[in-house]
Amino acid sequence: MDNISGYKDRAIESLTGKWGNSAIATLIYIIIFGGIAIAFSYGVPLTQSCSTKLDPLGNIIQIVLSPIAWGFEIMFLENIRKGDKELDLGKMFEGFKDYIRIMLTNLLRGIYTLLWMLLLIIPGIIKMYSYSMTNYILLDDPDLKYNSAIEKSMAMMKGHKMNLFLLDLSMIGWLILSIITCGIGILFLAPYNLTAHAHFYEDLKAEEQQNIAE
């Protein structure tokens, strides 16, 4: 496993020459999910005489579109594997090819995280990091789904949760910059963070394979 600086340097190297497309991909992602949040969190009247809130429907749509979130995440993993090739924005929508497995696995992941958060915040955060490799596992292990994929993520992250947390914490400066720039910085922070996560996963996978070989 690499150190924090190593993952950040590798992320920047992987995104060199691709920051523009990465920002465009992030903007598309924000527009899709941000638009849904605005439309359904604040409520859209069905008729002039009906002001019923559509929050439940909005939540359902968020779940239905979860493969896009999966695709956005794995797009950066595929990017580091491709090397010098252009960032493939189409990867963001590939989750719909394996729709049920991805959607239901992430639904379970979200439910488990929420239940832990309802108990205590810190255990919830710990579990969130335990489950953080699930989407990558869904990509690399097509036969795994639901609890099996989540459990494999938990096994891979055993002893590494703090490392990933500290990696995320080290990017707080970027987060502050995103706030100062009225959110513009997030167009670059998200690709940077997810690319660092992708490198982290690749090292976890290599470590797992080495342990199996031994």
What are these regions (language model features)?
Residues M1-E214:
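Hydrophobic alpha-helical membrane segments
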